[in-house]
Amino acid sequence: DRKLVMLEPGKKKWTLTFENKPSETADLVILANGGMSKVRKFVTDTEVEETGTFNIQADIHQPEINCPGFFQLCNGNRLMASHQGNLLFANPNNNGALHFGISFKTPDEWKNQTQVDFQNRNSVVDFLLKEFSDWDERYKELIHTTLSFVGLATRIFPLEKPWKSKRPLPITMIGDAAHLMPPFAGQGVNSGLMDALILSDNLTNGKFNSIEEAIEN
């Protein structure tokens, strides 16, 4: 429930400064705030890279009522379909909602600025209906039914460059902050959970003489 605005190393502890909240100190900082984290610089200088793929994501609540045709097409299973450069993935059982994502090669004219206004539902609907003009009507039902969309450029972190071995104080990263990857098949989520499991075990199993050794392992 706090927004971190500054992270500073002190003599023995980190100082965390929060927006409109008291500052705190910590012996160890674990970065788990996503691929666009501004404090990754303490661990690595590697910059985010664009993959050239763009994703549009959305959720439809009560899909059995709001988009029954597409919901029945899923038949209780996850669905994936591709055609002419567009890939659609749908999960009809996402905590009571139908979650779907559409991936495609980023158009050249989007390189500097996305040409679809994601604050304007009609702008997104018009774009998608044009892209899906020759798809089955049940896919178009999905688009027509959606109330809001989120647009995300797909980004990754190149893994060739090692993390900094000399850090001012104990600090490490897990999840997307550590290894951002395209959002397919749940691999990013699974990797993040495994990161957390391994790190928590290293910090508590008593096998290491210091925090630095635990996070290095």
Residue ranges and their predicted role:
Residues I30-L31, S148-N217:
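Conserved mid-domain beta->alpha element of the FAD-binding
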Residues I60, N94, F104, D136, ...:
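Generic secondary-structure microfeatures
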Residues R2-L142:
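Conserved FAD-binding catalytic core of PHBH/FMO-like flavoproteins
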Residues T46, W135, T146-F149, L203:
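Alpha-helix boundary/capping residues
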